[in-house]
Amino acid sequence: MNRLPSSASALACSAHALNLIEKRTLDHEEMKALNREVIEYFKEHVNPGFLEYRKSVTAGGDYGAVEWQAGSLNTLVDTQGQEFIDCLGGFGIFNVGHRNPVVVSAVQNQLAKQPLHSQELLDPLRAMLAKTLAALTPGKLKYSFFCNSGTESVEAALKLAKAYQSPRGKFTFIATSGAFHGKSLGALSATAKSTFRKPFMQLLPGFRHVPFGNIEAMRTALNECKKTGDDVAAVILEPIQGEGGVILPPPGYLTAVRKLCDEFGALMILDEVQTGMGRTGKMFACEHENVQPDILCLAKALGGGVMPIGATIATEEVFSVLFDNPFLHTTTFGGNPLACAAALATINVLLEQNLPAQADQKGDMLLDGFRQLAREYPDLVQEARGKGMLMAIEFVDNEIGYNFASEMFRQRVLVAGTLNNAKTIRIEPPLTLTIEQCELVIKAARKALAAMRVSVEEA
């Protein structure tokens, strides 16, 4: 039977939600009721699949905990009042922590002035953020297009490369195996996970994938494309593959790819949606090799964990294809005043507090601890790897990784797997994580592994 629209029901539901938003605390009964509501509404109106996915972060084995608020810069609190050290970081958005006061203040101040721009008049913060990014990014990167997410940033990069290279007869893109660039149609064409690709085949034509980190495979692909007349418009890759399992390429790989792009006249697109904004110990991961891309993609942490914003930054030579008609690629909410305020404040915090250097130092501390655990538990842990505060623990099979996430949840530490590698648990905390919290995370991991070994032995 078709359900008739109900204004009364919609009004009641929205009023109830607004009442919850206004509340600072909930009593025990309110918390229980909220848990029931959230689980029901996810099942009936969002997607029941998310409930099964979130079983690993549930102490009782039912469904995922219901998040209520940020506890501190580096912790989350659920509706039961339990505080968790955040080692997931919202998949890399909380580089400056949760509700960083500088970022929140900037957004609140802008909200009091003008939340969204008129679309017709010039908006100051978009101009100032573009200028700031031109100063912050490496090489000749100069012009910025702003959007709302990482996949939009990649879409813009692909379209920009097409617009620049099409008059030159170059239409092919080379991406890498294990890559994740987003799930919109163009970005998904560059992504290399069959689970995400197969339901939407055929994707955009002209994309090839080569093994990540293998420079000879890259050279061979570029040569073959040239021989067959399928000249390459651009190579797109992540400096470190995040969703692929935090896969680091061999030293010098990015430098060698840059040289190949120059040799074959291909643009180099670096997707730093996850690795950028100080995550790996430098402001941008490409700076570890002093590599300068033609197009750089940012998002996630750019908004400081407060506002969604993405950016596609390109050299003047490449970006100039949009000068004659700036409406070739636009978005209504991209570069809005609230998002730009958040991004400007985020950059300020990263630089003022030297958070990239802190990520380098604390990342080394965490990684040393995880590698020691890998030596102590070789029957469970295959490898610990990473750079800065982007790390991964790879287990000997998928089930162990799932159990580790569950055990860490019991220890009040939030972690999760990577999208393209089920055996790998990602460690991606805020860069503001304290030394004491780093020590607590290592202790929690040791307790989790010890409990898992006992379970395996008893089985």
Swiss-Prot record:
GO terms for molecular function: diamine transaminase activity; identical protein binding; putrescine--2-oxoglutarate transaminase activity; pyridoxal phosphate binding. Keywords: Aminotransferase, Pyridoxal phosphate, Transferase. The modification N6-(pyridoxal phosphate)lysine is found at K300. Its cofactor is pyridoxal 5'-phosphate. The keyword Transferase applies. Pathway: Amine and polyamine degradation; putrescine degradation; 4-aminobutanal from putrescine (transaminase route): step 1/1. Catalyzes the aminotransferase reaction from putrescine to 2-oxoglutarate, leading to glutamate and 4-aminobutanal, which spontaneously cyclizes to form 1-pyrroline. This is the first step in one of two pathways for putrescine degradation, where putrescine is converted into 4-aminobutanoate (gamma-aminobutyrate or GABA) via 4-aminobutanal. Also functions as a cadaverine transaminase in a a L-lysine degradation pathway to succinate that proceeds via cadaverine, glutarate and L-2-hydroxyglutarate. It holds the Pfam family Aminotran_3. Pyridoxal 5'-phosphate binds at G150, T151, Q274, T332. The keyword Transcription regulation does not apply. GO terms for biological process: L-lysine catabolic process; putrescine catabolic process. HAMAP family: Putres_aminotrans_3 (MF_01276). Gene3D superfamilies: Aspartate Aminotransferase, domain 1, Type I PLP-dependent aspartate aminotransferase-like (Major domain). Belongs to the class-III pyridoxal-phosphate-dependent aminotransferase family. Putrescine aminotransferase subfamily. This is Putrescine aminotransferase.
